[in-house]
Structures are given as structure tokens and as C-alpha cells.
């Protein structure tokens, strides 16, 4: 079995690549970072250090590495004979890897089983995004795309912080992970990935992860940044920050229980597990890293506005989520390009204009006025 994985960064090596290796796949990493690809190509193996209550070191070998920009033909050839293609590149980069994937699918010999494609990104239905981008590159004369490739959405969860300098290819990750995959597109030919969980209805798991892990993690970052703290574990050790994060997750918990029918005790236990992960002192994760890209995180269907809007539509005022949104609006990390752009939008627009532009909410939405009031507060603070 062979898997081609796009994105040889920390998540690619420390999560998706590791699980594919453990499943017995021959692994081909594809990336455009030349230094990283050169290091991988020259290495026989790398180690994944799982830190937490039961620390473990896992070694990954039997891999190759290719530069998908300068060695495109080689990547196409690998896809042409692969069983699985995965990505961990970021949702906005999927459109750039799609042309290579399309060429690889087109190069597959007749009679091969359909290529199994899964985007492992922090976005809802990321594989649908990738499928649409591949379809846009597909030549209809080659026949229907769905006859030669199967696209399945996934929900992925593992905290992989920025790595300390000088560690080379080794990656430090938390012990917890979750890779949930939609079983239905595969029919009787489900991929062999023992570390993954296959389900018939993925949406509840995607939203549970996004509205608990991603919402809570980012809330800890923004509240922690406001409190002048540097690490996520330090933020969660602060009683006020921890209480604010818990209040946010109490709101999303209620939404998830009522929307998807999760068992209350199981969902409460899930929240406790997630909060425990954020306090892991062995993960050197910073509020700046977790809080980066606030424009994306404040967008319409993301971790804050998404659940807050649904609660507002149900007649519930999401006070804690609004507090997190306010903290995100104040995230002014000078090293973050999106933070600078967010500040510029808030400063140069009316509160209503900024609310609509940043969040995608329309003025008639039941959440709009509350967010507009927060933007007005932030504008006043900047002027003061």
C-alpha cells in the first residue's frame, strides 16, 4: 500500500504521516518547502515524541519526499500508483495542490481501484473543497472523476505546537489524537487505517471537534493574550481565563447536545478531556500561535461566529462566545498579518461595515447587533 501526503510540516509528520506509517503504508511526502523536503529526502527516519501522562517515542521510516513544485512529474507518477492521497496544508492551500492531484489521477492506469482522497484540515468538509478544486482541473474527456477517485471528508484532532529550534525532523505532539473519516463514499473498499475511526455521519463529529477543541483552544489564546500570558498552559492555569474558556464550551456544549443529540454525560466528559489537554505543561504552545489568523477564525462558519450565530437563531444570547469574539477582535499580535489586517478593517470602517466584512453576518441576523456593539467598543478603545 502507498500513500502520498501533501504537507510535510509538523502535523503531516507528527499526525497523519505517523498514522499512515503505522497502518503499513509506504509514505511519500510532498511539499514546496525545499529545505524541509531536502532534510526528509536525506533522512532514513524521524521520531514523534508524544508527551503527556504516558510519554512515548514513535519512529517513522519507509518514506520518500518530493518537492511538488520542482518535482511535479515525480509527484504525479507517485499518485498514479498510490492507494491513498491525504493533505495537511491548510484549507486555503488546497487549490494549489489540486492541479497536481488531478494530473496524478489522470495518469492512473485503467483497472486500478479508485484513488482514495482525504483532506485532513481544520475546516468543515475540507475534502469537498479539494474535490471541487480537482474537478475544476479535470478533463471531462477522461471520463467521470468519481469513477477514478473517491473523496471522503474527515475530522482531525491533535495538538501539534511549533517545534523548538534545532530538533530537526523530530516532532513533539500530545498523546491524544482523533481522526474520524466518513465511511460512506468508500462503499465496501474502506481504507485500512487502524488509527482512524470510520463513521456513517461525519457532521456531528466535525462540529463537535470544531466547536469544542478549536473554539476552546482559540478562546484560551485570545483570553490569555488579553491577560498578558504567553503559553496556553499558563493561560489555563489562570483562574479567570480558565473560567471564561469553560463558559464558552458550556455554550457550545448545549448547542451540540440539542443539535446533534449527543449524550449529555458523554459530551460533558468530552469537554473535560479537551480542557485537560489545554493544560498540558509538556506542550510549549503559545497564545500567539494558537491565536494567529484571527480573520479566518472570526469568519462566518468558523469556531466563534458559527456556534454563536446558531445559538442566537435559537433565541439564546451567547454571552461567553461574545466575550471570546471581543477578545479575538483585540488580538493585536504585531507579527500576525491577519491581526494587522483586522485592526485596519476595524479602524477604517464603521462598526456595521466591519462586522459584516469580518464575520459575514448580515445586518438582519439576530447576532449582528451584539457583535456590532463589540466592534464599536474596540473602535473606541483604539481612539482613546
Swiss-Prot record:
<keyword id="KW-0560">Oxidoreductase</keyword>
<dbReference type="InterPro" id="IPR000669">
    <property type="entry name" value="Mannitol_DH"/>
</dbReference>
<dbReference type="InterPro" id="IPR036291">
    <property type="entry name" value="NAD(P)-bd_dom_sf"/>
</dbReference>
<dbReference type="InterPro" id="IPR013131">
    <property type="entry name" value="Mannitol_DH_N"/>
</dbReference>
<dbReference type="InterPro" id="IPR013118">
    <property type="entry name" value="Mannitol_DH_C"/>
</dbReference>
<dbReference type="InterPro" id="IPR023028">
    <property type="entry name" value="Mannitol_1_phos_5_DH"/>
</dbReference>
<feature type="binding site">
    <location>
        <begin position="3"/>
        <end position="14"/>
    </location>
    <ligand>
        <name>NAD(+)</name>
    </ligand>
</feature>
<dbReference type="GO" id="GO:0005829">
    <property type="term" value="C:cytosol"/>
</dbReference>
<protein>
    <recommendedName>
        <fullName>Mannitol-1-phosphate 5-dehydrogenase</fullName>
        <ecNumber>1.1.1.17</ecNumber>
    </recommendedName>
</protein>
<dbReference type="Pfam" id="PF01232">
    <property type="entry name" value="Mannitol_dh"/>
</dbReference>
<dbReference type="Pfam" id="PF08125">
    <property type="entry name" value="Mannitol_dh_C"/>
</dbReference>
<dbReference type="InterPro" id="IPR013328">
    <property type="entry name" value="6PGD_dom2"/>
</dbReference>
<dbReference type="InterPro" id="IPR008927">
    <property type="entry name" value="6-PGluconate_DH-like_C_sf"/>
</dbReference>
<keyword id="KW-0520">NAD</keyword>
<dbReference type="GO" id="GO:0008926">
    <property type="term" value="F:mannitol-1-phosphate 5-dehydrogenase activity"/>
</dbReference>
<comment type="similarity">
    <text>Belongs to the mannitol dehydrogenase family.</text>
</comment>
<dbReference type="GO" id="GO:0019592">
    <property type="term" value="P:mannitol catabolic process"/>
</dbReference>
Amino acid at each position: 500500500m502507498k500513500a502520498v501526503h501533501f504537507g510535510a510540516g509538523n502535523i503531516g509528520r507528527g499526525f497523519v504521516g505517523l498514522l499512515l506509517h503505522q497502518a503499513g503504508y509506504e509514505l511519500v511526502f510532498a511539499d514546496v518547502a525545499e529545505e524541509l523536503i531536502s532534510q526528509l529526502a536525506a533522512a532514513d527516519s524521524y521520531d514523534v515524541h508524544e508527551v503527556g501522562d504516558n510519554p512515548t517515542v514513535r519512529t517513522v521510516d519507509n518514506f520518500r519526499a518530493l518537492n511538488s513544485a520542482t518535482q511535479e512529474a515525480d509527484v504525479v507518477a507517485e499518485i498514479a500508483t498510490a492507494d491513498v492521497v491525504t493533505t495537511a496544508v491548510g484549507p486555503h492551500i488546497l487549490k494549489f495542490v489540486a492541479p497536481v492531484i488531478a494530473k496524478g489521477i489522470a495518469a492512473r492506469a485503467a483497472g486500478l481501484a479508485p484513488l482514495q482522497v482525504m483532506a485532513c484540515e481544520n475546516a468543515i468538509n475540507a475534502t469537498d473543497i479539494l474535490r471541487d478544486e480537482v474537478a475544476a482541473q479535470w478533463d471531462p474527456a477522461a471520463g467521470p472523476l468519481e469513477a477514478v477517485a473517491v473523496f471522503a471528508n474527515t475530522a482531525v484532532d491533535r495538538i501539534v505546537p511549533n517545534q523548538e529550534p534545532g530538533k530537526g525532523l523530530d516532532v513533539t505532539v500530545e498523546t491524544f489524537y482523533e481522526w474520524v473519516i466518513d465511511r460512506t463514499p468508500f462503499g465496501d473498499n474502506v481504507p485500512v487505517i487502524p488509527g482512524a475511526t470510520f463513521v456513517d455521519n461525519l457532521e456531528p463529529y466535525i462540529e463537535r471537534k470544531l466547536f469544542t477543541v478549536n473554539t476552546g483552544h482559540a478562546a484560551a489564546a485570545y483570553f490569555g493574550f488579553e491577560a498578558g500570558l504567553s503559553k496556553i498552559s499558563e493561560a489555563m492555569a489562570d483562574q479567570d481565563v480558565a473560567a471564561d474558556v469553560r463558559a464558552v464550551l458550556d455554550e457550545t456544549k448545549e448547542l451540540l447536545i440539542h443539535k446533534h443529540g449527543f449524550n449529555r454525560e458523554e459530551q460533558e466528559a468530552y469537554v473535560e478531556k479537551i480542557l485537560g489537554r489545554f493544560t498540558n505543561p509538556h506542550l510549549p504552545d503559545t497564545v500567539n500561535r494558537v491565536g494567529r489568523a484571527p480573520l479566518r477564525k472570526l469568519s462566518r462558519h468558523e469556531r466563534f461566529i458559527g456556534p454563536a450565530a446558531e445559538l442566537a437563531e435559537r433565541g439564546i444570547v451567547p454571552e461567553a462566545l461574545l466575550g471570546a469574539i471581543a477578545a479575538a477582535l483585540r488580538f493585536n499580535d504585531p507579527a500576525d498579518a491577519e491581526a494587522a489586517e483586522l485592526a485596519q478593517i476595524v479602524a477604517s470602517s464603521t462598526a456595521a461595515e466591519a462586522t459584516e466584512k469580518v464575520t459575514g453576518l448580515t445586518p438582519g441576523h439576530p447576532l449582528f447587533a451584539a457583535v456590532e456593539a463589540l466592534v464599536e467598543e474596540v473602535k473606541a478603545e483604539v481612539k482613546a
